Amino acid sequence: MASTWAIQAHMDQDEPLEVKIEEEKYTTRQDWDLRKNNTHSREVFRQYFRQFCYQETSGPREALSRLRELCHQWLRPETHTKEQILELLVLEQFLTILPEELQAWVQEQHPESGEEVVTVLEDLERELDEPGEQVSVHTGEQEMFLQETVRLRKEGEPSMSLQSMKAQPKYESPELESQQEQVLDVETGNEYGNLKQEVSEEMEPHGKTSSKFENDMSKSARCGETREPEEITEEPSACSREDKQPTCDENGVSLTENSDHTEHQRICPGEESYGCDDCGKAFSQHSHLIEHQRIHTGDRPYKCEECGKAFRGRTVLIRHKIIHTGEKPYKCNECGKAFGRWSALNQHQRLHTGEKHYHCNDCGKAFSQKAGLFHHIKIHTRDKPYQCTQCNKSFSRRSILTQHQGVHTGAKPYECNECGKAFVYNSSLVSHQEIHHKEKCYQCKECGKSFSQSGLIQHQRIHTGEKPYKCDVCEKAFIQRTSLTEHQRIHTGERPYKCDKCGKAFTQRSVLTEHQRIHTGERPYKCDECGNAFRGITSLIQHQRIHTGEKPYQCDECGKAFRQRSDLSKHQRIHNRRGTYVCKECGKSFRQNSALTQHQTIHKGEKSVSV
């Protein structure tokens, strides 16, 4: 049968669409009261325009006329400016070139411009870079269903996919849509996904018609095609009870319970839906529309009494309050660790089970979290959008760029709570902390202290006096190689660590970090006894000896002890017959530099008198 049909009535008119197949007329009961500013109606006409087939017309003139009409209904030049039309075309292409892993997620946000897409993607990138509990809520009974839905999402594109759009109408029940949005939250860990699920459980417009109309279009166009029961549930008896289930009066869709029947009839195109005047989105319940409209008005009526933060929905406020109460009701049966959200527990349990649901299509590598897959994909695409302005090195993640910039600035944001040592990278801090937490099984026979194997070897050199690392210039020896490297900079004059504020350079990174606190005024090391604060950990240790009375530096000549090494060095010059500091004018020697400086003023005075 040749499917030559023509649009008899424009969509602008308050008449239903008439479709002509051969000599018979079929009037679809699809709700064609699509407002001109409705985003979803524009999407329908865009798909008609893109999927239009030449064979559906009687000749080239009719084909051109039909294409013009569909394009007019999509772009609407009578209401849109040239800039708005260009933006629609750019948006369409932008969505098309996105990776498949991102397309479905971005389209869930219903962006209306390219800038909105960029904002959504940048927000996602920031959330993936920030550690923390991912947000999602779904019950344990849904777990098996959600796993199946994840599989279905991986096997095919969503109904609004721009890469592989098919002209086949699709209908999804509100239960299925809600559960799929929950799966999306698990995959991305996106806070907005939960807000959308809890506050504005929006319904996609139903009954999207295809470009080819079948004979039974008047029936199927109202609600679209439905999935068979066995596709969305694992219950084997679902098909056998099909004849006993209630059905929709409009299209014969089988429903499991009377409550489903009532809910289904509410969302059927034959029933009135609640549409948003601002963006055109439709909802099955008036309460959902009211909550959705708060996105446009900015109204946040639910306020936290603890911190004053406001939210659009009550359920989001309830979840937020867990932060203040510290409640962690979800506990892991394997290790006993507790979590504030079920989704965080679910992801944690994959560490014990070894489950990895997210697979890379290029190399097959699997990941337990969606965030891990997103970052891995950039290896194949070689996408490194974040560039360092100092050395032009590029990175795939903003967080890695931020850490890298610490190499140039000398910033060390990751500090050990045990010893105060700071690091540029968080991974370096984690490795360092293992020194404190690791079981120390190797004990020193001299003093009884315990160390790791390598730590014990270095420690024993204190007792044996062994210094295997020797300077080639001055032959000074050191216990550790790092100490030798830092010492050699005295001879080479190398000062690789430079202060951005004053330009002063240093041989050691730790000295630069302590110096920078002069500019910032930061004094992170505080004495528990008197409350005095210090810039460096060594200054605090020396100060604490005032309270403890400890004097670890002892003179070998007379046995006198001192708190600081510098005080011992000054004292030892008393025993040395020759003075350390010699005046270049007269050759006189002094034990202290301050005495030499004071002496040199005499020569300066003599020179001024003679002049």
UniProtKB/Swiss-Prot annotation:
SUPFAM superfamilies: beta-beta-alpha zinc fingers (SSF57667), Retrovirus capsid dimerization domain-like (SSF47353). Keywords: DNA-binding, Isopeptide bond, Metal-binding, Nucleus, Repeat, Transcription, Transcription regulation, Ubl conjugation, Zinc, Zinc-finger. It holds the Pfam family SCAN. InterPro entries: C2H2-ZF_domain, SCAN_dom, SCAN_sf, Znf_C2H2_sf, Znf_C2H2_type. It is found in: Nucleus. One of its GO terms (molecular function) is RNA polymerase II cis-regulatory region sequence-specific DNA binding. One of its GO terms (biological process) is regulation of transcription by RNA polymerase II. May be involved in transcriptional regulation. PANTHER family: FINGER PUTATIVE TRANSCRIPTION FACTOR FAMILY-RELATED (PTHR24384), GENE, 19965-RELATED (PTHR24384:SF246). Residues 203-230 have a biased composition (Basic and acidic residues). One of its GO terms (cellular component) is nucleus. SMART domains: SCAN, ZnF_C2H2. A zinc finger (C2H2-type) spans 274-296, 302-324, 330-352, 358-380, 386-408, 414-436, 442-463, 469-491, 497-519, 525-547, 553-575, 581-603. Residues 154-175, 198-264 are annotated as: Disordered. There is a cross-link at residues 20, 25, 196 (Glycyl lysine isopeptide (Lys-Gly) (interchain with G-Cter in SUMO2)). Its main location: nucleus. Belongs to the krueppel C2H2-type zinc-finger protein family. Residues 46-128 form the SCAN box domain. This is Zinc finger and SCAN domain-containing protein 12.
